[in-house]
Amino acid sequence: MVENSELRKAGLKVTLPRVKILQMLDSTEQRHMSAEECIKALMEAGEDVGLATVYRVLTQFEAAGLVVRHNFDGGHAVFELADGGHHDHMVNVETSEVIEFMDAEIEKRQREIVAEHGFELVDHNLVLYVRKKK
């Protein structure tokens, strides 16, 4: 469970909308949410937070390093809490579902490829676009 101290550590003032949005992102099973999905979840929880406020807060959270914004092809921005753990993504092109995965062999191979070309890996973002086999 995220705490108000997370907002303070990120240099943000503790406000009710920020707390509600941060708590919602932390408690939802859906780790990748658009601003519209955030609004829907907040409304379902009986919270009255406007769309403009959600966009503003998510942008502030991104700037403060609390969330990561992803702009997957063919869709709008989705946000996930920045928990510090590296992972890659698969995006179902038929449903827009985002699946997280981590594969040590893929990570190892990427470092090897970078080293073979005389570089050091600083960061990467791997997104696989997939659909269910028929």
UniProtKB/Swiss-Prot annotation:
UniProt superkingdom: Bacteria
Any Pfam family the entry gives: FUR
Annotated Zn(2+) binding sites: 32, 80, 89, 100
Gene Ontology MF: a single term: zinc ion binding
Region (DNA-binding): 1-83
GO cellular component terms, semicolon-separated: cytosol
Stretches the record annotates as Dimerization: 84-134
Keywords attached to this entry: Cytoplasm, DNA-binding, Iron, Metal-binding, Repressor, Transcription, Transcription regulation, Zinc
Listed Gene3D superfamilies: 3.30.1490.190, Winged helix-like DNA-binding domain superfamily/Winged helix DNA-binding domain
GO biological process, one term: negative regulation of siderophore biosynthetic process
Subcellular location(s) per record: Cytoplasm
Residues engaged in binding Fe cation: 86, 88, 107, 124
Function summary: Fur acts as a repressor, employing Fe(2+) as a cofactor to bind the operator of the iron transport operon. Involved in the siderophore pyoverdine (pseudobactin) 358 biosynthesis regulation.
Family (UniProt): Belongs to the Fur family.
Subunit annotation: Homodimer.
Name of the protein this chain belongs to: Ferric uptake regulation protein
This protein's encoding gene: fur
